[in-house]
Amino acid sequence: MSKVSGSNGGDSKNTLYCSFCGKSQHEVRKLIAGPTVFICDECVELCMDIIREENKTSMVKSRDGVPTPQEIIKVLDEYVIGQQQAKRILSVAVHNHYKRLAHAAKSSDVELAKSNIMLVGPTGCGKTYLAQTLARIIDVPFTMADATTLTEAGYVGEDVENIILKLLQAADYNVERAQRGIVYIDEVDKISRKSDNPSITRDVSGEGVQQALLKIMEGTVASVPPQGGRKHPQQEFLQVDTTNILFICGGAFAGLDKIISARGEKTSIGFGATVRAPEDRRVGEVLRELEPEDLVKFGLIPEFIGRLPVLATLEDLDEDALIQILSEPKNALVKQYQRLFEMEDVELNFHEDALREIARRAIVRKTGARGLRSIMEKILLDTMFELPTLEGVREVVISDEVVKGTARPLYIYSERSEEKTNVSA
């Protein structure tokens, strides 16, 4: 196959066109010639996107027709940087969950219990994003709930049954599909018990919510009002069995590392006591030693922890990981902004030092990967404001000085606009 480069000149009689989209060689970067047809670089890219999507949906299945853990983790790797242990735990847990459902469909005297998952990690390390990515690659209904909005039944706020309603809506009110879905409950650390004394006052948004979640996580038939909201006696309810719904809970658990560290220290007093240096390990390293008893001390009730037998801890992201997150995944932030600039026919490029400075600033803010977008927005705000009204800008280059605020982005103009400027001068 031969390549034909796009150019601005040329005889119209000899102009070649893409056989798929009909664009001429002057409208595209490359035109690839076959024996009797031509295809442009844009159509090649579109075809590759279609193939990638099909590969994602037609994952390799195990004997039970369930996606294999290797296949699940392979797709997770395309979107989520690092967190290999957490990805491994998640992929095995999801694989086993759907194997269990396939097993339950057959008559057997051995009943396989459900293994719900708890994700623990610092803010911005990828807990929510892992769950969202899982939802995209597994063909089951999925919903996310915020634990901070939940209250006990009868109080102002959302009932726990509303979570099942959201799952039912995600399944287009197909009860059978909803009963095989996945529910992710975020910010679960915010419903920890407010006091070590369980009888102090009624804790309707803390321990009360944990108690309310117990039955739906273990398995019960929930009565769900089809149009949402509070229940009315005249309403007809949909009955949803939650036995086969996989629950994943996630939270940052700020301060949990101190509880774990305190458990590991055997303090002594007197002249023979060992003088310990202050804890200099990263939060993610400390969380690896997490035990269920630490979560009880944090404020979760033992019954709630017992419904979440699979514990996965996530690492806090270092500078190198944040740089990878900025540039490597399929929907990396740099790629997103480059696509935005492409819509203005402008190429956006970042120096390696600029990405490193952005990562450093995110670490200082202690917001993890979540803080990267706000830093990028601040850096590119003036450029995005000016660009639509500027003529002839071909490329914008961001250096570390731009990130630090000591310089402006470098604008590179096309030769044509420079010629026009010289003529007008």
From Swiss-Prot:
InterPro entries: AAA+_ATPase (IPR003593), ATP-dep_Clp_protease_ClpX (IPR050052), ATPase_AAA_core (IPR003959), Clp_ATPase_C (IPR019489), Clp_protease_ATP-bd_su_ClpX (IPR004487), ClpX_bact (IPR046425), P-loop_NTPase (IPR027417), Znf_CppX_C4 (IPR010603). Residues 6-59 form the ClpX-type ZB domain. It holds the Pfam family AAA_2. One of its GO terms (biological process) is proteolysis involved in protein catabolic process. It comes from the Bacteria. ATP-dependent specificity component of the Clp protease. It directs the protease to specific substrates. Can perform chaperone functions in the absence of ClpP. Component of the ClpX-ClpP complex. Forms a hexameric ring that, in the presence of ATP, binds to fourteen ClpP subunits assembled into a disk-like structure with a central cavity, resembling the structure of eukaryotic proteasomes. This is ATP-dependent Clp protease ATP-binding subunit ClpX. The lineage of its organism: Bacteria, Pseudomonadati, Pseudomonadota, Alphaproteobacteria, Hyphomicrobiales. The gene is clpX.
